[in-house]
From Swiss-Prot:
Residues 396-415 are annotated as: Tail. This is Phakinin. Residues 2-114 are annotated as: Head. Gene3D superfamilies: 1.20.5.170, Single helix bin (1.20.5.500), Vasodilator-stimulated phosphoprotein (1.20.5.1160). It comes from Homo sapiens (Human). Residues 115-144, 199-253, 309-400 form a coiled coil. Required for the correct formation of lens intermediate filaments as part of a complex composed of BFSP1, BFSP2 and CRYAA. Plays a role in maintenance of retinal lens optical clarity. GO terms for molecular function: structural constituent of cytoskeleton; structural constituent of eye lens. One of its GO terms (biological process) is visual perception. The modification Phosphoserine is found at residues 26, 32, 35, 90.
Length: 415
């Protein structure tokens, strides 16, 4: 195969011409016109002031094959010296306008012209590289046709690349499923942790209601004891009042009539003496009766006053007893309402416990299922890892075979 020489004029002061050496090309398909019309990534990186590695790749690598070599033109083959690359780096850095150099339009225009010229030369070199790649591919295909085993090897490479791509996609799908399952488990855990404060608040409220019920029971017992003591005091006051009334009646009815037992004389003196004695007795009797009546009246007034005070006290006790009974009834109603509230809260707590138990059972079942799926996924991932290692081993073996084949081709070409 004949060699073609391309002379590249460098944008520096010293121009040089270097031969475009023959490079090894991979067995790629023909490059589309879009790769020729649009500037490649290497050109974009060169325009932005970034220096590529010593091997400058021209065109795009095929997406179907992972281990493709690609048509490559070295910096020496392109005829671009390191001095030009350093100048291009400094020029690319100078294109960033500083605040004090915004008016330097001439330098920017010169740099733009230099870049346009460089892009045109790179485009020409790409066309030359494409032609060389086509000729090299045709030459290698003709040799592979003569050897007779290149088609099977190429089919094996294509199937290996396809298997590796499918394995990568399947691994990504399994990773996505694992992340989705983990996110679902985290969501269930977060919901369970969010429900815990509500449950604790309900339990604290129920405990506070228990305390209120205990205090109400203690108050009820205290009021019942006070009512019993008031009833006993009222009974003792009633008995004392009856005893005082009976004693007063006895004092009023206790005056006994005196019997006259002296004989009546027949003489005037005896009659007068008898009348005088009788009169004295009547006077003394009247005086005693008047004193007794006065004393009885005083005692009656005192008893009436005491009775009035006792009646007032009894009325006050009746009012207090009525108020106490009203309070007891209200406390009983309150106790009944608290008991109803307690029963409702107990039912609610029972339902909440039942619901939480069901949720925990469901979560346990879900976690068990997820763990089983995770174990299956891990087993599949390990199997895929083994398959991937096997494919990588096959890929390395194929690369070694390709390298040996290229060495044979080089020896044939040199021979």
């Amino acid at each position: 195969m004949s060699e073609r020489r391309v002379v590249v004029d460098l944008p520096t002061s010293a121009s040089s011409s270097m031969p475009l050496q023959r490079r090894r090309a991979s067995f790629r398909g023909p490059r589309s016109s879009s790769s020729l019309e649009s500037p490649p990534a290497s050109r974009t990186n060169a325009m932005s002031g970034l220096v590529r590695a010593p091997g400058v790749y021209v065109g795009t690598a095929p997406s179907g094959c992972i281990g493709g070599l690609g048509a490559r033109v070295t910096r020496r083959a392109l005829g671009i010296s390191s001095v030009f690359l350093q100048g291009l780096r400094s020029s690319g850095l100078a294109t960033v306008p500083a605040p004090g150099l915004e008016r330097d339009h001439g330098a920017v225009e010169d740099l733009g012209g230099c870049l346009v010229e460089y892009m045109a030369k790179v485009h020409a070199l790409e066309q030359v590289s494409q032609e060389l790649e086509t000729q090299l591919r045709m030459h290698l295909e003709s040799k592979a046709t003569r050897s007779g085993n290149w088609g099977a090897l190429r089919a094996s490479w294509a199937s290996s690349c396809q298997q590796v791509g499918e394995a990568v996609l399947e691994n990504a799908r399994l990773m996505l499923q694992t992340e989705t399952i983990q996110a679902g488990a985290d969501d269930f855990k977060e919901r369970y942790e969010n429900e815990q404060p509500f449950r604790k608040a309900a339990e604290e409220e129920i405990n506070s209601l228990y305390k209120v019920i205990d205090e109400a029971n203690l108050t009820k017992m205290d009021l019942e004891s006070q009512i019993e003591s008031l009833k006993e005091e009222l009974g003792s006051l009633s008995r004392n009042y009856e005893e005082d009334v009976k004693l007063l009646h006895k004092q009023l009815a206790g005056c006994e009539l005196e019997q006259m037992d002296a004989p009546i004389g027949t003489g005037l003196d005896d009659i007068l003496e008898t009348i005088r004695i009788q009169w004295e007795r009547d006077v003394e009797k009247n005086r005693v009766e008047a004193g007794a009546l006065l004393q009885a009246k005083q005692q009656a007034e005192v008893a009436h006053m005491s009775q009035t005070q006792e009646e007032k006290l009894a009325a006050a006790l009746r009012v207090e007893l009525h108020n106490t009974s009203c309070q007891v009834q209200s406390l009983q109603a309150e106790t009944e309402s608290l008991r109803a509230l307690k029963r409702g809260l107990e039912n609610t707590l029972h339902d909440a416990k039942h619901w939480h138990d069901m949720e925990l059972q469901n979560l346990g079942a879900v976690v068990g299922r997820l763990e089983a799926e995770l174990r299956e996924i891990r087993a599949e991932a390990e199997q895929q890892q083994q398959e991937r290692a096997h494919l990588l081993a096959r890929k390395c073996q194929l690369q070694k075979d390709v390298a040996s084949y290229h060495a044979l081709l080089d020896r044939e070409e040199s021979g």
